[in-house]
Amino acid sequence: MKQAWNGWLLALQLFTTIPIRRSIAWNAAHVRWLVRCMPLAGALIGALSAGVYALFSTFSFSSPLVWALLLLWLGIWMAGGMHADGFMDVSDAFFSYRDVKRRQEIMSDPRVGAFAVLSLICLLSFRWLFLYESLQTGIPPALFAAVPLLSRAGAAWLLSVGKLAKPTGMAASLREYSSWRDAIWALGLAFVLLSLLCASTAISVQTGAALAAAAVVLAAAAKPWAEKQFGGITGDVLGALIEGGETVLWGVIWLLHSSVMG
């Protein structure tokens, strides 16, 4: 139990800006639980956003346009911008149209290129649009927890099954002490939490199933794509999957609710 708790705290330290003032050893037991808790860390970020949305959406002066922007940036800030940085690095490398070795070098370069900036603007613009349109339909706050829950569950799976692009870096550090069993744990925890949200009617079963299916397709497609384009997975690739996945999942929510409203 202590190892699980330390792994949970380590996940919060690494993947969120929640202040955990405690030194936790980076060892096999803690890292295994860190990987298992990745979806839960995402769900916590989403739950905080859901709480903010539920609290302030009751005010008559609330505007979907403003709230879409605030909730968008709240989610990115709570994740420390870590995954957005990975998305930018992957975009720079992919749009360089160079060979695999050069793309790996570009992802390791701390400098930011034009394609990274343009790609992030495009990504966040579409997410803001999907959020704005969805908020106007009166979506349940629980969806803010479901989206980051599923995006990080997909990243945990990709971490366990994908070929490593290099023996160093964040993905290699996590993979050193974890295995596919830990990914099964992560997927199981995500499934249980999503099922509870559906059972409590916080999210409809149809919406939950559609989001889960979309997350599965994204993670499954990311594996061969990353191995072809970058020689395997890296921490940046995992971050790109999380950020890109959240935008796609919000697009699915928008399509589902716009079709119902229509």
Curated annotation (Swiss-Prot):
Molecular function, one GO term: adenosylcobinamide-GDP ribazoletransferase activity
GO biological process, one term: cobalamin biosynthetic process
EC number: 2.7.8.26
Record flagged with keyword Transmembrane helix: yes
GO cellular component, one term: plasma membrane
InterPro entries in the record: CobS
Name used for this protein in its record: Adenosylcobinamide-GDP ribazoletransferase
Annotated source species: Geobacillus kaustophilus (strain HTA426)
